[in-house]
């Protein structure tokens, strides 16, 4: 879950003003929620643009959470718009309508969610809190609530360790992290959000989400840290850093990393021990044991290396390009 902290005078705290998703509050026990977070090398506005824009998923996230063959025109419309944000509706919905219609809410200034109900599966939300840290940096809090029609998916999700789920989340985030980091510098040179209509070409109904976000920014909110320049562009290696942007702050992932590093010497010991057994040619049973132990130890070392990399740094090579 999320813990909200009021930094002002206690008497001024108003729980009714918390940025919450009503559907999750109405019947919280009916939801299975996967949570993650990460510090991202981009402004909160850039993150919100990205997660609001549904049309990029089949292309940018091909082979992670999207497929190019599912791409289709997005006939979306804004259904409500005021100083508190906006709502939108996409009748066909993702995957060429296979998942049903999708509604979107932007709860200004930092919260958005997509909401759909897939026939035969259940209700699915994608919830994002984009929290500004400093110019060019924000913290993402992402929630993935599911309301299943069957108990089986809920059970299967519960069996998966949280740190493995977080590794999967990293892969999706890194699909577009590099060019989003570069993109906001291009927009900054063009004049930022006030110049977005001249800088961006947004002629289709797929663009209504991003256009509405910038209308809200220019009419009500303004960009965080307005007037401050973006920091220098980071290297790809820095952009792929998972350890400092997530793992060091995550109890599940940091504990898993400690266990993985502690297990590696034991796997090496088994591998060397099996080599000794293989060197004893006289006893065939020992040779068989040595071969099995060596194979299992080598596989374990390979998997430990993969998990450690998954918790510390991304490859920098998006699955769509492989």
Annotate each language-model stretch with its function:
Residues 4, 11-322:
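C-terminal catalytic domain of Rieske-type non-heme iron oxygenases
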């Amino acid at each position: 879950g999320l813990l909200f902290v009021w930094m002002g005078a206690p008497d001024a705290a108003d729980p009714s003003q918390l940025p919450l998703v009503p559907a999750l509050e109405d019947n919280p026990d009916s939801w299975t929620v996967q949570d993650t977070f990460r510090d991202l090398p981009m402004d909160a506005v850039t993150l919100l643009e990205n997660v609001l824009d549904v049309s990029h998923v089949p292309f940018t996230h091909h082979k992670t959470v999207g497929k190019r063959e599912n791409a289709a025109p997005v006939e979306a419309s804004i259904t409500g718009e005021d100083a508190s944000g906006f709502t939108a509706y996409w009748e066909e919905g993702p995957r060429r309508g296979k998942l049903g219609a999708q509604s979107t809410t932007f709860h200004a200034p930092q919260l958005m969610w997509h909401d759909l109900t897939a026939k035969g599966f259940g209700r699915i939300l994608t919830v994002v809190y984009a929290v500004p840290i400093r110019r060019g940096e924000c913290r993402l809090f992402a929630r993935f609530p599911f309301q299943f029609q069957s108990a089986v998916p809920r059970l299967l999700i519960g069996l998966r360790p949280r740190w493995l789920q977080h590794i999967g989340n990293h892969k999706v985030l890194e699909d577009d992290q590099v060019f989003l980091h570069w993109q906001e510098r291009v927009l900054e040179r063009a004049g930022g959000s006030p110049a977005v209509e001249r800088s961006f070409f947004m002629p289709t109904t797929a663009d209504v989400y991003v256009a509405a976000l910038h209308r809200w920014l220019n009419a009500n909110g303004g960009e965080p840290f307005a007037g401050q320049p973006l920091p220098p562009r980071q290297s790809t290696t820095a952009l792929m850093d998972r350890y400092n942007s997530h793992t060091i702050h995550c109890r599940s992932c940091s504990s898993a990393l400690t266990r993985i590093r502690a297990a590696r010497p034991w796997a090496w010991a088994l591998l060397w021990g099996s080599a000794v057994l293989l060197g004893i040619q006289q006893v065939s049973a020992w040779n068989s044991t040595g071969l099995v132990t060596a194979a299992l130890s080598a596989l374990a070392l390979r998997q430990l290396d993969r998990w450690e990399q998954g918790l510390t740094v991304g490859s920098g090579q998006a699955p769509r390009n492989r």
